[in-house]
Amino acid sequence: MAIINMSDLDLQGKRVLIREDLNVPVSNGVVTSDARLRASLPTIELALAKGAAVMVMSHLGRPTEGEYNSEFSMQPVVDYLAKALSSPVRLATDYLDGVEVAVGEVVVFENVRFNKGEKKNDEALSKKMAALCDVYVMDAFGTAHRAEASTNGVGLYAPIACAGPLLAQELNALGKALDNPARPMVAIVGGSKVSTKLTVLESLSGIVDQLVVGGGIANTFIAAAGHNVGKSLYEADLIDEAKRLVANAQSRGGDIPVPTDVVVAGEFSPTATATLKSVSDVSDSDMIFDIGPDSAEALAKIIESAGTIVWNGPVGVFEFDQFGEGTKRIAQAIADSKAFSIAGGGDTLAAVDKYGIADKVSYISTGGGAFLEFLEGKELPAVAMLKKRGA
């Protein structure tokens, strides 16, 4: 089933409603990080170039649903877009019963979460949104895993529902990485808990040639290999699960390597003293905060020979420089690799920024939860809706 792409449609004189992910941090009425806004601009500009009357909607923050709260208003986003597009952009507050929008004009709807029924994918709300447009464009990969009125319901009732360029690009990149990857395929999965990424680990262990674990997740695997992890964050109840994942990987000719050396400290703080130890020398009072240089080099070698790399999560507490060397080395290896690489997840993107490798990663995914669910092999509600409408 093919998804209709906005770029293939004739939008001349059409009312086009675009769902973007414009959920950006705002301080004192000013946008403080504009990455998502910048990513959405080409879609808005393309709709204008195609002669459309453009309406844009998004959520911002987590207001109480159904209640207006100026703290979560889209006004700062409107101000930003007006500057970026060098043309007036209007904020529409009461838009559900109809909104005037001319060809060549951009109107931004007030926060969709101010509408009662948004999160529950309310049918009546979805139909009201759908009645506002000739074409609905889903372009928000970051919210594609949520079945809500503005991301899913509206698309079921709009005359035409299609994918925007940003969403299409994201699905193509993820498809390239997961559906028919160049081998060997390496996945690096970090983060604090095995429990939150268990389904990702299970799904990836079935398709990758090499699964690399880092962060708190690695501590559970270190414990599963019979080593002391001291006071480190780990999940004792998931040790058997970790052993099963290792056995699965090995049965396919792969592995989930455990660090041979680690960086430890006695406390979790920006000023904690880092000590390098062999993984077999970790004491009861130690906390593991990073992989050591030998382990980092071994992982860098695995990355060097990869054909496809999926990176989700740092391998240490890189926010503190003394525990960032492992993640820095991994980032460098990915940057130097000729493989198709895709990185996603908030902490991962922070590491990509910190070590300045954004232009060396083949594709940076804008979605956090959606990226994870895609890796888990789940069909995202927004994608299912677009396939249904494209059939």
Swiss-Prot record:
It catalyses: (2R)-3-phosphoglycerate + ATP = (2R)-3-phospho-glyceroyl phosphate + ADP. The keyword Nucleotide-binding applies. It comes from the Bacteria. Belongs to the phosphoglycerate kinase family. Pfam families: PGK (PF00162). InterPro entries: Phosphoglycerate_kinase, Phosphoglycerate_kinase_CS, Phosphoglycerate_kinase_N, Phosphoglycerate_kinase_sf. ATP binds at K197, E319, G345, G346, D347, T348. This is Phosphoglycerate kinase. One of its GO terms (molecular function) is ADP binding. The keyword Mitochondrion does not apply. Monomer. One of its GO terms (cellular component) is cytosol. SUPFAM superfamilies: Phosphoglycerate kinase (SSF53748). Pathway: Carbohydrate degradation; glycolysis; pyruvate from D-glyceraldehyde 3-phosphate: step 2/5. It comes from Shewanella putrefaciens (strain CN-32 / ATCC BAA-453). Its EC number is 2.7.2.3. It is found in: Cytoplasm.
